[in-house]
Amino acid sequence: MGLNLLFLGVLLLPWASALLVALFPKPLFSISLTAVFSVAAMYFCTTAPVDFKIAYPWFNLGGQSLNASFWANAPAQLILGLVALVSFCVQLFSKSYLAKDPSIGRYYVYLHLFVGSMTLLLLTDSILIFYGAWELVGACSYLLISFWHQKSAATQAAKKAFLINRFGDIAL
Protein backbone atom coordinates (compact mmCIF):
# COMPACT_ATOMS: atom_id res chain seq x y z
CA MET A 1 0.00 0.00 0.00
CA GLY A 2 2.89 2.37 0.74
CA LEU A 3 4.20 2.18 -2.81
CA ASN A 4 0.74 2.95 -4.22
CA LEU A 5 0.51 6.02 -2.00
CA LEU A 6 4.01 7.12 -3.03
CA PHE A 7 3.07 6.72 -6.69
CA LEU A 8 -0.08 8.78 -6.19
CA GLY A 9 2.03 11.43 -4.47
CA VAL A 10 4.52 11.54 -7.34
CA LEU A 11 1.63 11.85 -9.78
CA LEU A 12 -0.25 14.59 -7.90
CA LEU A 13 2.56 16.60 -6.29
CA PRO A 14 3.33 18.80 -9.34
CA TRP A 15 -0.37 19.68 -9.67
CA ALA A 16 -0.68 20.49 -5.96
CA SER A 17 2.56 22.48 -6.23
CA ALA A 18 1.12 24.58 -9.06
CA LEU A 19 -1.88 25.43 -6.90
CA LEU A 20 0.26 26.21 -3.84
CA VAL A 21 2.69 28.36 -5.84
CA ALA A 22 -0.25 30.25 -7.35
CA LEU A 23 -1.35 31.06 -3.80
CA PHE A 24 2.16 31.70 -2.41
CA PRO A 25 4.36 32.82 -5.34
CA LYS A 26 7.80 32.65 -3.72
CA PRO A 27 10.71 31.15 -5.70
CA LEU A 28 12.21 29.37 -2.69
CA PHE A 29 8.84 27.79 -1.89
CA SER A 30 8.51 26.58 -5.49
CA ILE A 31 12.02 25.15 -5.51
CA SER A 32 11.34 23.39 -2.20
CA LEU A 33 8.21 21.77 -3.62
CA THR A 34 10.16 20.64 -6.67
CA ALA A 35 12.84 19.20 -4.41
CA VAL A 36 10.17 17.18 -2.58
CA PHE A 37 8.81 15.97 -5.94
CA SER A 38 12.31 15.06 -7.12
CA VAL A 39 13.13 13.11 -3.97
CA ALA A 40 9.76 11.30 -4.05
CA ALA A 41 10.18 10.48 -7.75
CA MET A 42 13.74 9.22 -7.26
CA TYR A 43 12.67 7.14 -4.26
CA PHE A 44 9.81 5.66 -6.28
CA CYS A 45 12.15 4.86 -9.15
CA THR A 46 14.58 3.04 -6.87
CA THR A 47 12.01 1.09 -4.84
CA ALA A 48 9.23 0.27 -7.31
CA PRO A 49 9.23 -3.03 -9.14
CA VAL A 50 10.42 -2.86 -12.73
CA ASP A 51 6.88 -3.30 -14.02
CA PHE A 52 4.65 -1.31 -11.65
CA LYS A 53 0.97 -1.13 -12.63
CA ILE A 54 -1.95 0.43 -10.80
CA ALA A 55 -5.53 1.39 -11.66
CA TYR A 56 -7.88 3.76 -9.89
CA PRO A 57 -11.63 3.60 -10.56
CA TRP A 58 -12.56 6.66 -12.58
CA PHE A 59 -16.29 6.33 -13.22
CA ASN A 60 -18.99 3.80 -14.10
CA LEU A 61 -21.02 4.11 -17.26
CA GLY A 62 -23.82 1.68 -18.05
CA GLY A 63 -22.43 -1.01 -15.79
CA GLN A 64 -18.95 -0.65 -17.27
CA SER A 65 -16.14 0.64 -15.10
CA LEU A 66 -13.58 2.99 -16.59
CA ASN A 67 -10.27 3.04 -14.75
CA ALA A 68 -7.48 5.57 -14.69
CA SER A 69 -4.62 3.14 -15.16
CA PHE A 70 -0.93 3.82 -14.87
CA TRP A 71 2.16 1.86 -15.75
CA ALA A 72 5.74 2.53 -14.72
CA ASN A 73 8.10 0.17 -16.51
CA ALA A 74 11.90 0.49 -16.38
CA PRO A 75 12.23 3.09 -19.19
CA ALA A 76 9.38 5.17 -17.72
CA GLN A 77 11.01 5.07 -14.30
CA LEU A 78 14.31 6.20 -15.79
CA ILE A 79 12.66 9.07 -17.66
CA LEU A 80 10.67 10.01 -14.54
CA GLY A 81 13.95 10.35 -12.67
CA LEU A 82 15.31 12.55 -15.48
CA VAL A 83 12.15 14.70 -15.49
CA ALA A 84 12.52 15.19 -11.73
CA LEU A 85 16.22 16.07 -11.98
CA VAL A 86 15.86 18.42 -14.95
CA SER A 87 12.84 20.21 -13.47
CA PHE A 88 14.77 20.79 -10.25
CA CYS A 89 17.76 22.18 -12.18
CA VAL A 90 15.49 24.44 -14.27
CA GLN A 91 13.89 25.79 -11.09
CA LEU A 92 17.30 26.51 -9.54
CA PHE A 93 18.51 28.29 -12.68
CA SER A 94 15.25 30.23 -13.00
CA LYS A 95 15.54 31.60 -9.48
CA SER A 96 18.58 33.68 -10.40
CA TYR A 97 17.67 34.30 -14.05
CA LEU A 98 14.19 35.64 -13.24
CA ALA A 99 15.04 37.09 -9.82
CA LYS A 100 13.87 40.60 -10.68
CA ASP A 101 10.86 39.59 -12.78
CA PRO A 102 7.60 40.54 -11.05
CA SER A 103 5.79 37.64 -12.74
CA ILE A 104 8.09 34.90 -11.46
CA GLY A 105 5.21 33.28 -9.57
CA ARG A 106 3.26 32.83 -12.81
CA TYR A 107 6.35 31.26 -14.41
CA TYR A 108 6.67 28.75 -11.58
CA VAL A 109 2.97 27.85 -11.83
CA TYR A 110 3.41 27.16 -15.55
CA LEU A 111 6.52 25.11 -14.85
CA HIS A 112 4.81 22.96 -12.22
CA LEU A 113 1.86 22.41 -14.58
CA PHE A 114 4.30 21.40 -17.32
CA VAL A 115 6.06 18.91 -15.04
CA GLY A 116 2.72 17.51 -13.89
CA SER A 117 1.59 17.11 -17.50
CA MET A 118 4.85 15.40 -18.47
CA THR A 119 4.60 13.05 -15.50
CA LEU A 120 1.02 12.18 -16.37
CA LEU A 121 1.91 11.68 -20.05
CA LEU A 122 4.81 9.44 -19.10
CA LEU A 123 3.04 7.21 -16.61
CA THR A 124 -0.50 6.80 -17.92
CA ASP A 125 -1.73 3.57 -19.43
CA SER A 126 -5.03 5.09 -20.57
CA ILE A 127 -5.44 6.55 -24.05
CA LEU A 128 -7.89 9.21 -22.81
CA ILE A 129 -5.55 10.42 -20.10
CA PHE A 130 -2.62 10.23 -22.53
CA TYR A 131 -4.42 12.50 -24.98
CA GLY A 132 -5.39 14.95 -22.23
CA ALA A 133 -1.83 15.01 -20.90
CA TRP A 134 -0.50 15.50 -24.45
CA GLU A 135 -2.73 18.54 -24.88
CA LEU A 136 -1.71 19.90 -21.48
CA VAL A 137 1.99 19.56 -22.33
CA GLY A 138 1.35 21.54 -25.52
CA ALA A 139 -0.60 24.23 -23.66
CA CYS A 140 2.05 24.53 -20.96
CA SER A 141 4.79 24.73 -23.61
CA TYR A 142 2.90 27.58 -25.23
CA LEU A 143 2.51 29.36 -21.88
CA LEU A 144 6.17 28.94 -20.96
CA ILE A 145 7.45 30.05 -24.36
CA SER A 146 5.19 33.11 -24.31
CA PHE A 147 6.00 33.95 -20.68
CA TRP A 148 7.39 37.34 -21.72
CA HIS A 149 4.40 38.00 -23.95
CA GLN A 150 5.31 41.70 -24.13
CA LYS A 151 8.24 40.77 -26.38
CA SER A 152 7.43 40.19 -30.02
CA ALA A 153 9.98 37.38 -30.36
CA ALA A 154 8.39 35.42 -27.49
CA THR A 155 4.94 35.80 -29.00
CA GLN A 156 6.15 34.67 -32.43
CA ALA A 157 8.00 31.69 -30.96
CA ALA A 158 4.91 30.68 -28.98
CA LYS A 159 2.75 30.81 -32.12
CA LYS A 160 5.30 28.73 -33.99
CA ALA A 161 5.43 26.14 -31.18
CA PHE A 162 1.64 26.05 -31.07
CA LEU A 163 1.41 25.32 -34.80
CA ILE A 164 4.11 22.66 -34.64
CA ASN A 165 2.26 21.02 -31.74
CA ARG A 166 -0.93 21.01 -33.80
CA PHE A 167 0.88 19.03 -36.52
CA GLY A 168 2.01 16.58 -33.85
CA ASP A 169 -1.58 16.33 -32.63
CA ILE A 170 -2.76 15.43 -36.12
CA ALA A 171 -0.15 12.65 -36.26
CA LEU A 172 -1.28 11.41 -32.85
Each predicted region: which residue ranges?
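Bulky hydrophobic/aromatic packing residues
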Residues: P14-S17, S69, F88, V115, ...
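Short conserved micro-motifs on helix faces and helix-strand junctions that flank
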Residues: L11, F70-W71, A84, L123, ...
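Generic alpha-helical transmembrane segments of integral inner-membrane proteins
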Residues: L12, A16-L19, L85, C89, ...
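Cytoplasmic juxtamembrane interface segments
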Residues: P14-L28, L144-T155
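Transmembrane helix-loop-helix hairpins at membrane boundaries of multipass inner-membrane proteins
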Residues: M1-L6, A16-V109
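Alpha-helical multi-pass transmembrane bundles of energy-transducing inner-membrane proteins
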Residues: Y107-L172
